[in-house]
């Protein structure tokens, strides 16, 4: 559902960034496929147990692997189709926030990607049939039972934190892109910075993280995204917006020419389709017209025949009533 809604949004939003819908479709299609492959590969690489890449029964996807693979695939596709890469990444960043916001609720259904046990009094803490069997939750519950306060061991709903974080980011960047965007690629840089900040904090609460030595992989990647994204954003604001004659892609002549050619071609194809449909309808109506013409011809023929017969009868009757001149003489 998240992928579908993200795709619909990107197709609707692409005109604002000067992108052609067909190009967005091609890039999104490739990015989605490689995104799933990358998410699985990332998980299999960093998981501390042996796992079969193709054994999906036990799940195992990592969002950062999906983002990295999707970004690489999208970049290659943009180069092949000669599409403006920064503008495409801006649309992609907004779409990713939608997909992540909704997709995280799959963790709730599967009772996974949750955080450490709380003190038991957290109003939005969660539990479940899978969660209560977690060794850390069992230990926390024993501690609470020993205290005799009647509380249950609840865990941090990390999926909810990330879903809300992505929702807030999407709303903010959606409106930011309309009025405040000043250079191509800016929205994507803000996306990786915003998501990196939230993920770094949320990952500290999770108990199922992937590790490199003593460090959580997602925290390393998130921290790197924040540093790189923020640095490039500041540099873009300093150099691109102050650069004399800088024009965003959507306002460039190249963009206008591409869009004019594309929509002119679309209009021509629509007119051809309408003409073809009209010809088809005319072809379906033609047999009925022919049948009606034949019926009218048959009616006219029968009427003429009746008139001829009447004339013949009259002429015969006149001959019988006329006296023979030879007899009179």
Language model: regions and residue ranges:
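N-terminal leader/transit sequences and adjacent low-complexity N-terminal tails
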Residues: 306-329
């Amino acid at each position: 559902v998240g992928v579908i809604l993200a795709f619909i949004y990107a197709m609707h939003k692409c005109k604002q960034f000067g992108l052609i819908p067909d190009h967005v479709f091609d890039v999104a299609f490739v990015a989605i496929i490689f995104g799933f492959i990358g998410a699985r590969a990332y998980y299999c690489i960093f998981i501390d147990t042996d796992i079969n890449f193709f054994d999906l029964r036990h799940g195992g996807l990592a969002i950062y692997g999906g983002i990295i693979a999707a970004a690489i695939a999208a970049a290659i596709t943009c180069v092949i189709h000669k599409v403006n890469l920064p503008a495409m990444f801006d649309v992609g960043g907004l779409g990713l926030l939608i997909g992540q916001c909704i997709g995280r609720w799959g963790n709730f259904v599967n009772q996974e990607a949750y955080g450490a046990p709380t003190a038991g009094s957290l109003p939005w803490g969660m539990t479940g049939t899978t969660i209560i069997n977690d060794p850390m939750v069992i230990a926390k519950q024993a501690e609470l039972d020993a205290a005799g306060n009647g509380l249950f061991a609840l865990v941090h709903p990390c999926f909810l934190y990330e879903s809300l974080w992505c929702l807030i980011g999407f709303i903010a960047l959606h409106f930011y892109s309309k009025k405040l965007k000043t250079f191509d690629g800016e929205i994507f840089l803000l996306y990786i910075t915003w998501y990196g900040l939230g993920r770094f904090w949320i990952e500290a609460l999770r108990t199922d993280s992937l590790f490199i030595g003593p460090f959580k992989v997602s925290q390393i990647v998130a921290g790197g995204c924040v540093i790189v994204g923020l640095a490039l954003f500041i540099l873009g604001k300093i150099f691109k917006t102050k650069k004399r004659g800088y024009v965003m892609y959507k306002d460039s002549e190249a963009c206008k020419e591409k869009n004019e050619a594309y929509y002119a071609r679309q209009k021509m194809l629509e007119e051809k389709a309408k003409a073809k449909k009209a010809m088809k309808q005319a072809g379906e109506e033609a047999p009925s017209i022919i049948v009606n013409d034949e019926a009218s011809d048959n009616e006219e023929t029968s009427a003429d025949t009746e008139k001829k017969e009447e004339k013949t009868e009259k002429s015969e009757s006149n001959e019988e009533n006329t006296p023979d001149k030879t007899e009179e003489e």
